[in-house]
Amino acid sequence: VILLLLTASAPSVDARPKTEDVPLSSFRDNTKSTLQRLLKRVNCCGIDESCCS
């Protein structure tokens, strides 16, 4: 009976805030590579139009 009361009063999985499963380091790596790609495109397009795709 006590176990049932404890189980019923415990917070459910739905009550917890949702978080991403992706580790922070992976997020940083993705952000860094995206920024590098954008910077390369900006610098390249000023010089050579063929790399702007």
Swiss-Prot record:
Tissue specificity: Expressed by the venom duct.
Pfam families, sorted: Chi-conotoxin
Entry's Gene Ontology molecular function annotations: ion channel regulator activity; toxin activity
InterPro entries to which the protein is assigned, alphabetical: T-conotoxin
Signal peptide from the UniProt entry: 1-15
Keyword line: Cleavage on pair of basic residues, Disulfide bond, Ion channel impairing toxin, Neurotoxin, Secreted, Signal, Toxin
Places the protein is found: Secreted
Prodomain positions: 16-41
Entry comment on modification after translation: Contains 2 disulfide bonds that can be either 'C1-C3, C2-C4' or 'C1-C4, C2-C3', since these disulfide connectivities have been observed for conotoxins with cysteine framework V (for examples, see AC P0DQQ7 and AC P81755).
Main location: secreted
GO cellular component: extracellular region
UniProt comment concerning the protein's domains: The cysteine framework is V (CC-CC).
Family indicated by similarity: Belongs to the conotoxin T superfamily.
Protein's name according to its UniProt entry: Conotoxin Vc5.3
Organism: Conus victoriae
